[in-house]
Regions:
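N-terminal binding-site loop/beta-alpha segment at the start of enzyme catalytic domains
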Residues: 4-134
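Beta/alpha (TIM)-barrel catalytic core signal, keyed to glycine-rich beta->alpha loops juxtaposed to Asp/Glu
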Residues: 15, 20, 28, 32-35, ...
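Acidic (Asp/Glu)-rich catalytic clusters
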Residues: 66-69, 100, 122-133, 162-166, ...
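Short acidic capping loops at alpha-helix termini that bridge into adjacent secondary structure
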Residues: 73-74, 107, 131-134, 168-172, ...
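Active-site mouth loops of central-metabolism enzymes
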Residues: 78-89, 140-152, 176-181
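Short, acidic/polar
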Residues: 86-98, 149-165, 213-218
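A short, structured active-site edge motif that brings together acidic residues
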Residues: 132-144, 231-235
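Active-site groove signature of glycoside hydrolases
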Residues: 162-183
């Protein structure tokens, strides 16, 4: 166990509200997808036993989120595209595949698709009777429903989240807006009230600088209320500056768990966009990494070389690099289809050597 990277546990027979079911996607309730089954089978065959031992559910490694009791699979599923670019049927297939591989950590936002993302996740949990198998994280504070971090705004936003999710609590609530016009005391007391009411188990921050993390720790100690346990931050091989440095130092000092947003650079690190021509031809590519700099293409080249040597996808290596970093509990990649899930959940099984990590560090610095 490496305390610098968060507590890790290998669970043989998971039980309890945070444990994932040890089942294959084919065994899950709901309509079968033979094309997905064939794709997953072919992907398994591509993984050599020595580097990515994928023969069914991924070995159930769990990481603890900060000082909480939440034990999660080291790769979360980003559900913010559900209801926007991903319809309910495709979202269900993604979640089925993820759960089938042992995944139990679903991340979304109250603002995603105007709340539709939470509704789709809630419908899926009900249809699969999966609420006790998964850890649900959502964010409040932005969007049009109940924006802001005042006591009234947070309380209203969480109640609406719970209604859409069809549950009586969220496991991890992030505040994704930092509003200096609202006292931090009011915001933190509002969260404390929700925790006391059983509507929220733990909370984190998602749009806050290091000085606000320090301030939050001081205020929660003075008020005697639960502290921040997690930070969600934009962090990837393409964007290291927002986290590494002073912010990472504060996170380590406070023992927070980090979840990394945009860990694949909006798809660029998945290897789809291998040239400036590819990027120019794809609107998503242009919006993700404009301009297509030489540095970014060099990062992709080194990433792809390591992936080829290990017989895994570039996305798998990009996530494995993050998982090798201190305090990172789980990257939160987006996914557009069930066939992509294996490349993501395979990342915890890929233990990069220090030379591979160093090569990626150098090219991305």
């Amino acid at each position: 166990m490496n305390a610098g990277r968060g507590d890790e546990l290998t669970v043989a027979e998971p039980t309890g509200p945070c444990a994932a079911a040890s089942v294959s996607p084919r065994a899950l309730p709901g309509p079968a997808d033979p094309l997905l089954d064939l794709r997953l089978a072919s992907l398994r065959e591509e993984q050599p036993r020595e580097s990515s031992p994928v023969t069914g559910p991924i070995p159930l490694r769990r990481r603890r989120i900060g000082d909480s009791s939440l034990l999660v699979f080291p790769v979360a599923i980003n559900g913010t595209g559900f209801g926007r670019t991903i319809d309910a049927v495709s979202a269900g297939g993604i979640l089925d595949a993820y759960r089938g591989f042992g995944g139990n950590f679903i991340d979304t936002s109250s603002a995603a698709a105007g709340g539709r993302s939470e509704s789709i996740i809630g419908d899926w949990m009900r249809s699969r009777r999966a609420r006790s198998d998964v850890v649900i994280a959502t964010r409040v504070g932005s969007g049009t429903g109940s924006p802001g971090v005042s006591q009234a705004a947070i309380s209203t936003a969480v109640d609406r989240c719970l209604e859409r999710l069809g549950t009586d609590h969220v496991d991890l609530l992030y505040l994704d807006t930092d509003d200096p016009s609202v006292s931090f005391e009011e915001t933190l007391l509002a969260v404390d009230a929700l925790i006391g009411a059983g509507k929220v188990r733990f909370f984190g921050l998602a749009a806050h600088a290091e000085n606000r993390l320090v301030e939050a720790r001081v205020i929660t100690a003075q008020l005697g209320v639960p502290p921040v346990v997690a930070l969600q931050v934009h962090y990837s091989l393409l964007r290291r500056d927002l986290f590494e440095g002073t912010l990472a130092g504060v996170v380590a000092e406070q023992g927070l768990g980090v979840t990394a947003r945009f860990p694949l650079g909006a798809g660029f690190l998945g290897g789809k966009y291998r040239s400036a021509v590819d990027l120019a031809a794809c609107p998503r590519g242009r919006s993700a990494v404009t301009p297509p700099t030489r540095r970014r293409l060099r990062v992709l080249a080194v990433l792809s070389q390591i992936a080829r040597e290990r017989h895994v996808a570039p996305a798998t290596v990009a996530l494995a690099w993050l998982l090798a970093k201190p305090r990172v509990v789980a990257p939160v990649p987006g996914v557009s289809g069930p066939e992509q899930v294996l490349d993501l959940v395979a990342a915890p099984s890929v233990q990069l050597t220090r030379h591979e990590v160093a090569a990626l560090d150098r090219v991305s610095s």
